Curated annotation (Swiss-Prot):
Protein family per UniProt: Belongs to the HesB/IscA family.
NCBIfam families, A to Z: iron-sulfur cluster assembly accessory protein, PRK13623.1
Keywords for the protein's UniProt record, in alphabetical order: Iron, Iron-sulfur, Metal-binding
Record-given protein name: Iron-sulfur cluster insertion protein ErpA
Species: Shewanella halifaxensis (strain HAW-EB4)
Protein purpose: Required for insertion of 4Fe-4S clusters for at least IspG.
Cofactor(s) listed in the protein's UniProt record: iron-sulfur cluster
């Protein structure tokens, strides 16, 4: 996929996130798993992000493939994530997947919840 084509996607899946998913799937020995990102009500800012591994792609789900692994987003969550990026970081504060969301008007200190 070209950089221009990747920029046109509703949500981006970084190399760091895809690489970590690939490593985790190899450890689990289950290539059918996909990283699902979703938005639910809650958290200190109104909405919160969630991540889980899922074997299914449901009707209407949006998928992005990178490095042979898939990111899956349900249509309801996608409307809050358009233009965003799913990334992965590892540092002194620990390791985690996170969302860079240009639609968030406020976020909490830990970055796990947001409002629009």
């Amino acid at each position: 996929m070209t950089e221009q084509a990747e920029d046109a996607l509703p949500i981006r899946f970084t190399d760091a996130a895809a690489s970590k998913v690939k490593t985790l799937l190899e450890e689990e020995e289950n290539d059918a798993l996909k990283l699902r990102v979703y938005v639910t009500g809650g958290g200190c800012s109104g909405f919160q992000y969630g991540f889980t591994f899922d074997e299914k792609i449901n009707e209407g789900d949006y998928t992005v493939e990178k490095q042979g692994v898939q990111l899956v987003v349900d249509p309801m969550s996608l409307q809050y994530l358009v233009g965003g990026e799913v990334d992965y970081t590892s540092g002194l504060e620990g390791s985690r997947f996170f969302v860079k969301n240009p639609n968030a008007t406020t976020t909490c200190g830990c970055g796990a919840s947001f409002s629009v």
